[in-house]
């Protein structure tokens, strides 16, 4: 052969194991024909060995067919035992039909046993559903979602440092996006609102420490107010806030409290009163001042301007320390008198504060007989904005007293508290109710930090009940999507926003719908609170707009989820420089970064969204697996567990389930207990199955290779017969033991083909089979079917072209033309994340 190869060139093409084309001399023709016959026969013999024997027409009575008939009867028995109607039917009374399960054996799982054997054992020893009587609320370290350990009050709680998070509106131009029209400002319009009294603003979570709890809540709200996150109520039409005002707030800013004169009467504090006042107040701007029409000062006519004392601010249960303002209907009241001897154009000192400027005279120190009203902003005089405030968009000269804050002096100075800096007064186009819509309480900041408090805001009326709102949906990546968008083999850096929700400003009219109180004062959220379902949607829009600009401007792969940013780049040194530039870019726009939770330098393994992500794989931390195994070991077989506790347990299992060899159908018995709100009891085999899942830990590859194998096996079924056909032309026909629904018969044949042939993919004309959603079937059969068909790909083929359609009707198979398509829905990936 070597000699022949030197003299002549021989080309061998492999087709069905033979030689298709041979170029040789005349003397080699006979030898070539011999080689073709020998090699072809040998390869055909190998094909016959690999091809399933029962699919040959001459081997219908073979051993393979008898084994297939046996497996089919086992599958049919699983279907016919209707688990859903008999053994998993919840019972409302503990009768003879529902007995407490017997004590199972201690958990000694055979780790080497295949998962399929453990699954079959669990279908024999079934878990049980019980009644609604009280049961165990603890499963290891887990407890029911609504039976959690009571919060412990800490009188030494510290209010965390909250900084002013005011992002610059230049971000709209720097980061062009359509999202900004929903964020500048954000709007919140509930259909209907339930208002509550101010006195119930703090939830009685700690009955033994009510006053201390309210005191710390008050400090927390004050800290939020000083950070510019809350409005503070002054009256029905006036609120104050700190920080820099936004553009939409400037048109409603005022420098003092004005009302229009009128003869309208109102009922305040239970008394019918007349709002007409005869005392006039000299305006703070000069008559001939050319800048008196300044955009942030609400000018009112001399003859119609009146200073209106503060109405009740929700603090009538606590008398003020420095005296109270006038009651509208009281006999003896404090009247604010005008002092026309002073001019508002007094000289200004170096700090921008008028020297002994008196626009209003001090209040009389007369005791009142009416109800006391608490006002923290005007304790004994009417104060406007104070020093240190700059007018946005327009410079203010010291001589222009119309824009300079005024304050009282003289007798009232010694009784008034220190003036507040950078305070703005807003008279919006809405009314500010003296009621609340949400309630507050404090808890530990987290399990590792019990020294600082966390404020919990309960606005649940907007997510459930008669006032429930349908909040907009937004794209959130699941595990499958995250695997497909993460780049492979790149160093990564994670960034975390500080106080992310407090970056999102609200429309003032929307803020009036989000009212809270510490029992004395009423506050309204100026920024998005964390207790409203709209806030995550707004934060998603916010970070998505930033992430798109970061990716475009710095040429780096960027992914954002809520307040987390993930940056990836092939060059670690370049990524390190980019991260510093990104932080500087965000900080220049007023967006704060939490450097405690930010990766300082590029790393190859990072923790993101609870997953451990390295260059090529995603996995769950080993500590989490150990905790879950410990919980499963502490399951007591035969005891009833409350459904709320099971709900907590299922949540942990669902998170790790994609990293196991199991499927969601294995958790269906616990889902049945949760849905029907009944007790649940574990069987010994079911507990072993759950433990087996945590032992078969696997890691998921990033950017998995998608293979589209050529289908070689097709299945079809009629109510009485089923068939399996192979692309080689062989087929096998089976008779069912009874008539069932057609989708069940189709699934039986697909499972049988998987057990006996083990193909990489299957053809079926049943959409029920191709979608792999078997929740309506009995649990043990659905679990087995899901486990069998999960690793293979199912293609849908129309019945007209199904190759197995002929054998199921006693006709020959036809593999000449069969158009097929996968029915699995394509995973949605945003355009900017594609191509990585």
Curated annotation (Swiss-Prot):
Residues that bind Mg(2+): 496, 563-564
Region described as Spacer: 251-414
Entry domain remark: Terminal protein domain (TP) is hepadnavirus-specific. Spacer domain is highly variable and separates the TP and RT domains. Polymerase/reverse-transcriptase domain (RT) and ribonuclease H domain (RH) are similar to retrovirus reverse transcriptase/RNase H.
Location of the region described as Terminal protein domain (TP) in the Swiss-Prot/TrEMBL record: 51-250
InterPro entries linked: DNA/RNA_pol_sf, DNApol_viral_C, DNApol_viral_N, Hepadnavirus_pol/RT, Rev_trsase/Diguanyl_cyclase, RT_dom
Lineage: superkingdom: Viruses
Family label: Belongs to the hepadnaviridae P protein family.
Region annotated Polymerase/reverse transcriptase domain (RT), chain positions: 415-703
Catalytic activity as recorded in UniProt: DNA(n) + a 2'-deoxyribonucleoside 5'-triphosphate = DNA(n+1) + diphosphate; Endonucleolytic cleavage to 5'-phosphomonoester
Residue ranges of every copy of the Reverse transcriptase domain listed in the record: 424-613
EC identifiers of the protein: 2.7.7.7, 2.7.7.49, 3.1.26.4
Regulation: Activated by host HSP70 and HSP40 in vitro to be able to bind the epsilon loop of the pgRNA. Because deletion of the RNase H region renders the protein partly chaperone-independent, the chaperones may be needed indirectly to relieve occlusion of the RNA-binding site by this domain.
GO biological process: DNA replication; reverse transcription
Site note Priming of reverse-transcription by covalently linking the first nucleotide of the (-)DNA, residues: 146
GO molecular function: DNA binding; DNA-directed DNA polymerase activity; metal ion binding; RNA-directed DNA polymerase activity; RNA-DNA hybrid ribonuclease activity
Region span, RnaseH domain (RH): 704-836
Compositional bias (Polar residues): 377-400
Role: Multifunctional enzyme that converts the viral RNA genome into dsDNA in viral cytoplasmic capsids. This enzyme displays a DNA polymerase activity that can copy either DNA or RNA templates, and a ribonuclease H (RNase H) activity that cleaves the RNA strand of RNA-DNA heteroduplexes in a partially processive 3'- to 5'-endonucleasic mode. Neo-synthesized pregenomic RNA (pgRNA) are encapsidated together with the P protein, and reverse-transcribed inside the nucleocapsid.
Protein name: Protein P
Source organism (scientific name): Duck hepatitis B virus (strain United States/DHBV-16) (DHBV)
Listed Basic and acidic residues bias regions: 285-296, 331-342
């Amino acid at each position: 052969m070597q000699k022949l190869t030197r003299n002549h060139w021989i080309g061998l093409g492999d087709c069905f194991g033979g030689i298709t084309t041979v170029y040789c001399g005349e003397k080699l023709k006979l030898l070539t024909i011999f080689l073709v016959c020998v090699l072809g026969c040998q390869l055909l013999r190998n094909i016959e060995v690999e091809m399933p024997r029962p699919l040959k027409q001459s081997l219908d009575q073979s051993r393979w067919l008898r084994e297939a008939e046996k497996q089919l009867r086992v599958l049919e028995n699983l279907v016919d035992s209707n688990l859903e109607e008999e053994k998993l039917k919840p019972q409302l009374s503990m009768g003879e039909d529902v007995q407490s399960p017997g004590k199972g054996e201690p958990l000694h799982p055979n780790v080497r046993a295949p998962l399929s054997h453990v699954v079959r054992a669990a279908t024999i020893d079934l878990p049980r559903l019980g009644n609604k009587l009280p049961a165990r609320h603890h499963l290891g370290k887990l407890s029911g979602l609504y039976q959690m350990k009571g919060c412990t009050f800490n009188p030494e709680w510290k209010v965390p440092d909250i900084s002013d998070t005011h992002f610059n509106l230049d971000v709209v131009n720097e980061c062009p996006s359509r999202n900004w029209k929903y964020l500048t400002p954000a709007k919140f319009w509930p259909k209907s609102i339930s208002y509550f009294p101010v006195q119930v603003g703090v939830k009685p979570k700690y009955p033994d420490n009510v006053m201390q709890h309210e005191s710390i809540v008050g400090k927390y709200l004050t800290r939020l107010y000083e950070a510019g996150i809350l409005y503070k109520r002054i009256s029905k039409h006036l609120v104050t806030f700190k920080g820099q005002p936004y553009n939409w707030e400037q048109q409603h800013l005022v420098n003092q409290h004005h009302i229009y004169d009128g003869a309208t009467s109102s009922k305040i504090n239970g008394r019918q009163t007349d709002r007409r006042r005869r005392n006039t107040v000299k305006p703070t701007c000069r008559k001939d001042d050319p800048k008196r029409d300044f955009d942030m000062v609400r000018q009112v006519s001399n003859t119609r301007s009146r200073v209106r004392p503060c109405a009740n601010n929700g603090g009538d249960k606590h008398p003020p320390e420095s005296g109270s303002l006038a009651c509208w209907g009281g006999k003896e009241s404090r009247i604010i008198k005008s002092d026309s001897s002073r001019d508002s154009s007094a000289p200004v000192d170096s700090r921008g504060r008028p020297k002994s400027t008196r626009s209003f005279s001090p209040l009389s120190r007369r005791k009142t007989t009416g109800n006391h009203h608490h006002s923290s902003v005007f304790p004994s005089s009417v104060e406007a904005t104070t020093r240190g405030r700059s007018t946005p968009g327009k410079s203010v000269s010291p001589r222009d007293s119309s824009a300079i804050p005024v304050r009282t002096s003289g007798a009232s100075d010694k009784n008034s508290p220190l003036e507040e800096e950078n305070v703005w007064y807003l008279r919006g186009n809405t009314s500010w109710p003296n009621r609340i819509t949400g309630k507050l309480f404090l808890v530990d900041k987290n399990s590792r930090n019990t020294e600082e408090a966390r404020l919990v805001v309960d606005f649940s009326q907007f997510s459930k009940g008669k006032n429930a709102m349908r909040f907009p949906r937004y794209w959130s990546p699941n595990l499958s999507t995250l695997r497909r968008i993460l780049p492979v083999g790149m160093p990564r850096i994670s960034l975390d926003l500080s106080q992310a929700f407090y970056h999102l400003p609200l429309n003032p009219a929307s803020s009036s719908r989000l009212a809270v109180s510490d029992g004395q004062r009423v506050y309204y959220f100026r920024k998005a609170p964390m207790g409203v379902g709209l806030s995550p949607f707004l934060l998603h829009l916010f970070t998505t707009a930033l992430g798109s600009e970061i990716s475009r401007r710095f040429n780096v792969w960027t992914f954002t989820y809520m307040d987390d940013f993930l940056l990836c780049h092939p060059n670690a040194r370049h990524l390190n420089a980019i991260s510093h530039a990104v932080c500087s870019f965000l900080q220049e726009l007023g967006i704060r970064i939490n450097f405690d939770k930010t990766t300082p330098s590029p790393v190859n393994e990072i923790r993101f969204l609870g997953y451990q992500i390295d260059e090529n794989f995603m996995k769950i931390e080993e500590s989490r697996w150990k905790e879950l195994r410990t919980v499963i070991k502490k399951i007591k077989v035969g005891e009833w567990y409350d459904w709320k506790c099971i709900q907590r347990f299922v949540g942990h299992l669902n998170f790790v389930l994609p990293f196991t060899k199991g499927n969601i159908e294995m958790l269906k018995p616990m889902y049945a207990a949760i849905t029907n709100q009944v007790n649940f009891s574990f069987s010994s085999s079911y507990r072993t199955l759950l433990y087996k899942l945590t032992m078969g830990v696997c890691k998921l590859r990033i950017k998995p290779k998608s293979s589209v194998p050529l289908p070689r096996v097709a299945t079809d079924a009629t109510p009485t017969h089923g068939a399996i056909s192979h692309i080689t032309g062989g087929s096998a026909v089976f008779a069912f033991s009874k008539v069932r629904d057609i989708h069940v018969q189709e699934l039986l044949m697909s499972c049988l083909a998987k057990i006996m042939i083990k193909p990489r993919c299957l053809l079926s004309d049943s959409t029920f089979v191709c979608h792999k959603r078997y929740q309506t079937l009995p649990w043990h059969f659905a679990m087995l079917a899901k486990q069998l068909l999960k690793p293979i790909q199912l293609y849908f083929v129309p019945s007209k072209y199904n190759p197995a359609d002929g054998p199921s009707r006693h006709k020959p198979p036809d593999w000449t033309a069969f158009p097929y398509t996968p029915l699995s829905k394509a995973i949605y990936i945003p355009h900017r994340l594609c191509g990585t």
